[in-house]
Amino acid sequence: MSAFLTALVPVILLVALGQFLAKRGLVPAEAFRALDRLSFLVLLPALIIRALANAEFDGAPWVMLGALIAAQVLLGAFGLSARFWPGIAPPAIGTIIQSNVRWNTIIGLSLGGLLFGDEGLALVSLAAAAMIPVANVISVYALVSHAERPPGDKPRPLLALTRNPLIYACLIGIALASFHVRLPVIADESLKMLANAAIALGLLSAGAGVDLGALQRAGLRTFTWSLVRLIGLPAVTLVIGLAIGLSGLPLAIALICAATPTAPNSYVLARELGGDAGLAANFIAAQTLLAALTLPLTWGVILWLGAV
């Protein structure tokens, strides 16, 4: 457990530092938005390409992807049960479904790298290659189908995926690894420099994006569905993973990815597609804080299973 806390505490500290810098106005909101854009377009793709290109995969990671995707689909479907919550509006249902299927890639990459080095980074990157498209498609359809707005042009989730640089980075990295193409030294070192900046800046930006004021507006619905997400996704991943023979490091990485809080950009997507943006902000704040408690519990399960 001490090794996990050694990896988790720096992540929490950087998220807290980002919140402090934003709250005090020491770094303007525009600067963090620019950092988000830089990370999305350049830094994270560089990290993913390098991690995947230098990885050596056997059959286990593909079983890992199957468990993660199946868990996303099942927990997304479970979100439909929110319609039985008294007084709930349709946009909130779409937002709950989105919360259930999205995950924080930056925190996953941070923990995977700190705990397991390059192999951990590669496995988390591979998980991202599968989970990001699934999360985007489910989220867009859920938000649009539950939105209360005049009929008009419907967003096209598949088109949105073609504009996502993280997807291209995953495809490039997997292609390089599949064909055993080694990156030239100069290219590898350049990507390494960009990758080193990706996680630190991403965690600072994630902290800046947490609206602590949202916790004051949060109620039973927010905390109930936050716990469903933080406990439910890793639990379903574990059951499916064990059923299909997942074990060892891939199992540990799958559980870590599933146990991260919902994605910070879920607020923007909810706002743009007619979801309940206020509830999305509540989920981000509540899950980011609760994950500091649930992630160590997940690690305890990993140790109990002897996965690492």
Question: What role is predicted for each listed range?
Answer:
Residues 1-308:
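Alpha-helical transmembrane segments of multi-pass small-molecule/ion transporters
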